[in-house]
Amino acid sequence: TDDFTATNAEIATAYEKFNDTENVDLSLLLCGPSQTGADATGDTKATAVMDIATARKDCVAFISPARTDVVGVANAITQTVNVKNFANGLPSTSYAVIDSGYKYMYDRYNDVYRYVPLNGDTAGLCARTDSVADAWFSPGGFNRGQIRGAVKLAFNPNQTQRDDLYKARVNPVANFPGQGT
């Protein structure tokens, strides 16, 4: 682009390189942040990543909601509704994992704290579980589901909110006192 800022549509086009199952070996496909200024919902990029995983049938897409759905939203009920609406706007597939948000972490390269989407962490947990256990073991829970480097979560759903998110195909990430994230 001429302004050096890629839109979600341009990023979705770049993801099309992953459609080639013969030349591209792929197990985990990360969406990254689900929002840029040109596509406030993030649906374009998330849908493209999900479509690739669904078509290939040999990988899993990892999706986080749009940053504005959870970061800077003071009310947890609104965050729950936002995340559910985001997930409901995406196609349904067995080849994608949608998580509930962003973690606040220290960026040692820029010496600042920032919010980062959890889809990279979720994919990392899946990769780690595959290496220490077997692919059919859950990467969640207190033993295998610890998110590293999280200072806090932008959205820490309670039990009722987690139940609502499960119904919307969202895998909630929560912080439990004494257990971590």
Enumerate the language-model features and the residues they cover.
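A glycine- and small-residue-enriched flexible loop/hinge signal that marks low-structured segments
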Residues: 1-181
